[in-house]
Amino acid sequence: MMENEQSVIGIQYGDVDGDYKCEKIILMGIPYEEGSSFMSEVELIVHYMDDAKFKFKIDFSGYAINLFLGDFLQEGYDQILITGQSGGNGNYVLTRLYKFEQNRLKLVIDDEDLSNLLQYQTFYQNDGQIGVQSLATGAVFTLNVRGRRLTSPGYNPMPQPFSPPSVSTINTIYPIKQPYSNYYTLQLQQRIIGEVNADILGMMQTVIELTQLVPVIQSQAIVQFS
């Protein structure tokens, strides 16, 4: 069986080392099969205009991998954001944010760090409402599920499930820039699900700032699904 060859996942141009010059950033990977969006053995290449190259093996594999350059740390030059999806039932987001300094890649944050920050406790409130509390900030958000059946007939004959809905790990991630801002933040979304993954009741949406020594939650909101 012939092994699949490396394919280009993405190419971006930007100043990633603060020298005020543009570098070419290339992300490569090996597809599972021809035409597949699942990539493994990911490699990042920093290509200088004088033809010098630095290559790095990235411990990363997944679907729909994307490369993005932007200043997340408010340092005046770009960092390297790699995102993808795990696929499968949960289909959670995969994330690596790197900075390039002294010809080396330094990991700033990954999906595990973000997931550890965005933990929640859910509980029933009165009159058909569910409380969703952020363990990081203590803020409580309310989800109205009045009149909505939270369980399938085969799971639980009681009118209320034994345990409240849960908040999934991070499902989507977007780099965003606020008006009049000179740096990027990360917008993250997590599904609020009932007894099965297909029962999506709502979504937690969080914006995280990375300009401090630790990631800071800038804002959080709950999105109600009808």
Locations of the language-model features?
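Beta-propeller-forming repeat regions
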Residues: 1-226
